[in-house]
């Protein structure tokens, strides 16, 4: 499977059986810069803390950098 990986947001080959993920959360700059984003791959969908959103998928390049709606 190919997944996008941060910080470069490049498509890389991950190990067989892995899933791609998109993890987003707010930090001190959330209101002006938007949510922080972490893209990668893992053996299983990562468990996250409260306040962190995670989306996992299992097709090539299914985790592109999320687009931000501009006001």
Swiss-Prot record:
GO terms for cellular component: extracellular region. Expressed by the venom gland. Keywords: Acetylcholine receptor inhibiting toxin, Disulfide bond, Ion channel impairing toxin, Neurotoxin, Postsynaptic neurotoxin, Secreted, Toxin. Binds with high affinity to muscular (alpha-1-beta-1-gamma-delta/CHRNA1-CHRNB1-CHRNG-CHRND) and neuronal (alpha-7/CHRNA7) nicotinic acetylcholine receptor (nAChR) and inhibits acetylcholine from binding to the receptor, thereby impairing neuromuscular and neuronal transmission. Ranges of nAChR inhibition are in nanomolar (competitive binding with alpha-bungarotoxin gives Ki=1.66 nM on muscle nAChR and Ki=4.84 nM on alpha-7). Disulfide bonds join 3-20, 14-41, 26-30, 45-56, 57-62. It holds the Pfam family Toxin_cobra-type. It is found in: Secreted. This is Long neurotoxin Tx-NM3-1. PROSITE patterns: SNAKE_TOXIN. The lineage of its organism: Eukaryota, Metazoa, Chordata, Craniata, Vertebrata. GO terms for molecular function: acetylcholine receptor inhibitor activity; ion channel regulator activity; toxin activity. Belongs to the three-finger toxin family. Long-chain subfamily. Type II alpha-neurotoxin sub-subfamily. InterPro entries: Snake_3FTx, Snake_toxin-like_sf, Snake_toxin_con_site, Toxin_cobra-type.
């Amino acid at each position: 499977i190919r997944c996008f990986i941060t910080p470069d947001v490049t498509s890389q080959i991950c190990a067989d059986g892995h899933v791609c993920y998109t993890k987003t959360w707010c930090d001190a700059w959330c209101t002006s810069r938007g949510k922080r984003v972490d893209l990668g791959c893992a053996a299983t969908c990562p468990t996250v803390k409260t306040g962190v959103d995670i989306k996992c998928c299992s097709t090539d390049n299914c985790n592109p950098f999320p687009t931000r709606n501009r006001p």
